[in-house]
């Protein structure tokens, strides 16, 4: 019976420590900056698409 109590206590302790260490760390900010940069590039390409299409049509005309 003592073994089961000790086992339960150790299991609860490990579970508590694993949930605390799962908190996000500051190093994730680097990936967020990379993601934001990629988003800005994608949005710039989407916005420039119609202008590039107009230039292509103008070049084809003459």
UniProtKB/Swiss-Prot annotation:
GO biological process assignments: antibacterial humoral response; defense response to Gram-positive bacterium; innate immune response
Annotated keywords: Amidation, Antibiotic, Antimicrobial, Immunity, Innate immunity, Secreted, Signal
Places the protein is found: Secreted
Claim: Signal is one of the keywords in the record: yes
Subcellular location, principal: secreted
Residues recorded as bearing Leucine amide in the entry: 61
PROSITE patterns hit by this protein: CECROPIN
Assigned GO CC terms: extracellular region
Propeptide cleavage-removed residue intervals: 23-26
Lineage top rank: taxon: Eukaryota
Pfam family, one: Cecropin
Signal sequence range: 1-22
Protein purpose: Cecropins have lytic and antibacterial activity against several Gram-positive and Gram-negative bacteria.
Family designation: Belongs to the cecropin family.
Name of the protein: Cecropin-B
Species name: Hyalophora cecropia (Cecropia moth)
């Amino acid at each position: 019976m003592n073994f089961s109590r000790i086992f339960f206590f150790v299991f609860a302790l490990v579970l508590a420590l694993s949930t605390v260490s799962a908190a996000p760390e500051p190093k994730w900010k680097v990936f967020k900056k990379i993601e934001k940069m990629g988003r800005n590039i994608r949005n710039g390409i989407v916005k420039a698409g119609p202008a590039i299409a107009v230039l292509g049509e103008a070049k084809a005309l003459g």
